[in-house]
Regions:
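A generic "folded-domain core" signal
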Residues: 35-186
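Cleavable N-terminal signal peptides
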Residues: 21-22, 32
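Bacterial N-terminal signal peptides that target proteins for export
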Residues: 6-21
């Protein structure tokens, strides 16, 4: 809620929504690109990888889904999606210490939430363009704590075209990957 409040009260009046979307996409698309092409991958922890960038210092753990299901009107459909990634980010310069971020590889339906289910416990992530986040730093911490205890995370979302997606991520190596990324950014 705090992140949304900051956006609504401070950022929104300053710039247009299109500018914010462009900035978010540019900023976070570097993570997706780095997952595929970066030579800054420093470690693997089972199903999770750790990346580090310098200047400014950024560290993140990231994973791709093990299973993806796309449906429309209750039927499984084949759709083209970009990178589907789940991150935990650390950026000391910005005082970001464990921010959960998800990209589904498509623009989310406007005003929609992504449902994150960790072993039966549900969490709502707010969306902007192709990205989704927890609503506050406290929510980030609660979700990450649940993920450390869990076996899998299922993210369910709706695209701007009405496609329902369900992405299942393994949490094997999650705890070690997050700890490693955090340590590298201290």
């Amino acid at each position: 809620m705090i992140k949304e409040q900051v956006y609504m009260k401070i950022l929104k009046p300053l710039v247009s929504v299109k500018s914010i979307i462009a900035l978010i996409c540019i900023t976070f698309s570097t993570y997706a690109y780095a997952q595929e092409t970066s030579s800054n991958k420093v470690a693997d922890k089972t199903d999770w990888a750790i990346f580090v960038e310098d200047n400014p210092k950024e560290c993140w753990s990231v994973s791709k889904p093990k299973k993806t299901i796309n449906t429309r009107d209750g039927r499984i459909v084949k759709v083209k999606r970009g990178d589907i990634l789940l991150f935990v980010n650390f950026r000391p310069e910005s005082k970001v210490n464990g921010q959960l971020t998800f990209t589904g590889g498509y623009p989310f339906a406007e005003g929609s939430n992504v449902n994150l289910n960790v072993d039966g416990t549900n969490f709502a992530l707010f969306t902007e363009g192709e990205w989704a986040w927890a609503r506050s730093d406290e929510d980030d911490a609660t979700i990450i704590k649940a993920m450390k205890k869990g076996a899998k995370a299922i993210l369910t979302a709706k695209s701007s075209r009405g496609t329902q997606t369900q992405d299942t991520f393994s949490l094997l190596g999650f705890t070690a990957a997050v700890a490693d990324a955090e340590k590298r950014c201290k």
